[in-house]
C-alpha cells in the first residue's frame, strides 16, 4: 500500500493506493532540492543587478519624486513579501524614500483585501512603512487614456496612471485566457476598470490562447495598452507551489517578460500523451483552492487528461465558497447551465464566464468534488459531493479495467499537445 496526498487548503488529504495497481502521476516540473527563502532572494537580487532592456531601477528612480508598485493579490502564488524589499532598496538608492512609494494590489475584479491579508501579502518589513492600496475597478476610480485597435478602453487606476514611475511585479505561469500571466497583466486586468477587463476578456471567446504562449490577440491587446500608460520597470518571477522562486527576470516590460516566459517554458505544461478513465486532482492547496472561481482552473487542466465519458475527483477546500458574487448570483438564480451559456454567448460577462469553462468540462466528464463548499453550491455547479476521498479512490482502484491518474498540483499543470 502506498500513501499519496492531495494538497487541500493549508493542509493535505492522504489517500491509500493498493500495491501493484498502476497510478500515473501528472506533475509539473519543480526541483525537489535546493529551494529556500534565501535562494529565492538571491535569484531576485541577481535579476535586479542585470535588468533586460533598461537601466537599473535605482537609475530609473533618479530624478523622480514618486513611484508606484503593482503587486499580485492573495489568490496568486507570487511572493510579494520577497519582491518588495529589494525593489524598495533600489528606489531608495535612486532617491525615492518609503513615504514616496505607493503599493497597489492589482486585484482586477477580485475582492478587496483585509488589513491582515495585506500584512501577510507584503510582509512585516514593508507593512506600515509604505502605503498599500486595494485597486478599485469602478470607472470613477480610473482614468480613461485611450482605446486599443481591438476596441478595449484603456481605463487605469488613477493613482497608477498619475505616477511618474510605474513598476509591475508578478508571477509567470500559463493562463487560460491570455496564454501566460505576468508582464502587462499587472496593469490590465490588475489595475484596470471593469470595462477594460470585460472587453479584453471578451476577446478570448473568439481567440483561444495556447497555455504558456503570449502570442495571441488577447495578450497582444493588453500589451497595446502600454502605448497609453507605460510600465517603466518589470520584476517577474517563476515560482513553485511553495512560493519558492525558480527563476527571475526584470527590466523592460516586454523583453523581461519574454525572457521569463522562456525560462518557464515547458515547466508548467505536460504533453497529453494519454487520457485516463479517472483523474484524481487537487487544485494545489492554498491559495489555489481558496474559492471555486480559482479551483476551476485545475478542473479544466484535469479534463484535458481525462477520456470523454470519464470521471474527475477534484479536491479543493474553497473556504471562500464560490469566490465571485456575480457567478454565484447566476448559479443561484438561473440554475440551468445551458441557459447561462446561451446568455454568455449573447453578452460576455467576467465572473459568469467561468460557466463556459464549467460547461466545457461537464459536457464530456462527470465531476466528483471533495470540498468545504456548501452542498447546494456543489449541486448547482453540476458536481457530485464526496465526503470521503478514500471511498472514491477505493471504488476506482478496485475496477482493474480503469486507467487512473493523479494530479497533485492541478492549477499549475497545464496540458500541451504531444510532440509529433
Language-model segments: residues:
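Short internal beta-strands
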Residues: 98-109, 311-316, 366-371
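C-terminal catalytic subdomain
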Residues: 289-367
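Membrane-embedded hairpin module used as a gating/binding unit in multi-pass transport
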Residues: 209-286
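Short glycine-rich or small-residue beta-strand-to-loop segments that form or flank ligand, phosphate
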Residues: 66-77, 102-108, 168, 280-282
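N-terminal amphipathic/basic leader segments beginning at the initiator methionine
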Residues: 1-47
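Internal helix-turn-beta structural module
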Residues: 352-411, 418-419
Amino acid at each position: 500500500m502506498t500513501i499519496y496526498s492531495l494538497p487541500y487548503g493549508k493542509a493535505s488529504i492522504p489517500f491509500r493506493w493498493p500495491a501493484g495497481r498502476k497510478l500515473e502521476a501528472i506533475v509539473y516540473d519543480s526541483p525537489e532540492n535546493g529551494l529556500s527563502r534565501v535562494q529565492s532572494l538571491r535569484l531576485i537580487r541577481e535579476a535586479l543587478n542585470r535588468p533586460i532592456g533598461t537601466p537599473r531601477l535605482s537609475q530609473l528612480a533618479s530624478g523622480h519624486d514618486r513611484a508606484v508598485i503593482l503587486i499580485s493579490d492573495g489568490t496568486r502564488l507570487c511572493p510579494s513579501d520577497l519582491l518588495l524589499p529589494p525593489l524598495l532598496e533600489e528606489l531608495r538608492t535612486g532617491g525615492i524614500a518609503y513615504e514616496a512609494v505607493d503599493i497597489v494590489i492589482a486585484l482586477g475584479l477580485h475582492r478587496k483585501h483585509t488589513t491582515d491579508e495585506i500584512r501577510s501579502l507584503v510582509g512585516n518589513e514593508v507593512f506600515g512603512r509604505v502605503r498599500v492600496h486595494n485597486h478599485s475597478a469602478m470607472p470613477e476610480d480610473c482614468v480613461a487614456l485611450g482605446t486599443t485597435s481591438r476596441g478595449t478602453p484603456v481605463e487605469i487606476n488613477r493613482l497608477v496612471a498619475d505616477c511618474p514611475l510605474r513598476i509591475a511585479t508578478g508571477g509567470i505561469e500559463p493562463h487560460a485566457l491570455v496564454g501566460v500571466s505576468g508582464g502587462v497583466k499587472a496593469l490590465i486586468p490588475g489595475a484596470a476598470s471593469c470595462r477594460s477587463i470585460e472587453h479584453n476578456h471578451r476577446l478570448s471567446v473568439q481567440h483561444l490562447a495556447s497555455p504558456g504562449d503570449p502570442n495571441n490577440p488577447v495578450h497582444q491587446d493588453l500589451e497595446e495598452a502600454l502605448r497609453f500608460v507605460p510600465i517603466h520597470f518589470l520584476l517577474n518571477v517563476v515560482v513553485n507551489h511553495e512560493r519558492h522562486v525558480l527563476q527571475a527576470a526584470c527590466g523592460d516590460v516586454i523583453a523581461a517578460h519574454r525572457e521569463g516566459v522562456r525560462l518557464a517554458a515547458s515547466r508548467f505544461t505536460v504533453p497529453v500523451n494519454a487520457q485516463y478513465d479517472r483523474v484524481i486532482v487537487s487544485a494545489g492547496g492554498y491559495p489555489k483552492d481558496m474559492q471555486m472561481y480559482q479551483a476551476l482552473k485545475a478542473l479544466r487542466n484535469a479534463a484535458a487528461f481525462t477520456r470523454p465519458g470519464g470521471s474527475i475527483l477534484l479536491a479543493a477546500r474553497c473556504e471562500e465558497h464560490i469566490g465571485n458574487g456575480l457567478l454565484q448570483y447566476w448559479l443561484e438564480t438561473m440554475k440551468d447551465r445551458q441557459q447561462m451559456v446561451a446568455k454568455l454567448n449573447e453578452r460576455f460577462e467576467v465572473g459568469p464566464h467561468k460557466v463556459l469553462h464549467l460547461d466545457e468540462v461537464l459536457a464530456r466528464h462527470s465531476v466528483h468534488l471533495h470540498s468545504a463548499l456548501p452542498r447546494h453550491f456543489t449541486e448547482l455547479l453540476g458536481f457530485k459531493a464526496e465526503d470521503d476521498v478514500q471511498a472514491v479512490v477505493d471504488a476506482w482502484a478496485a475496477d482493474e479495467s480503469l486507467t487512473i491518474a493523479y494530479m497533485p498540483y492541478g492549477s499549475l499543470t497545464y496540458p500541451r499537445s504531444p510532440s509529433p
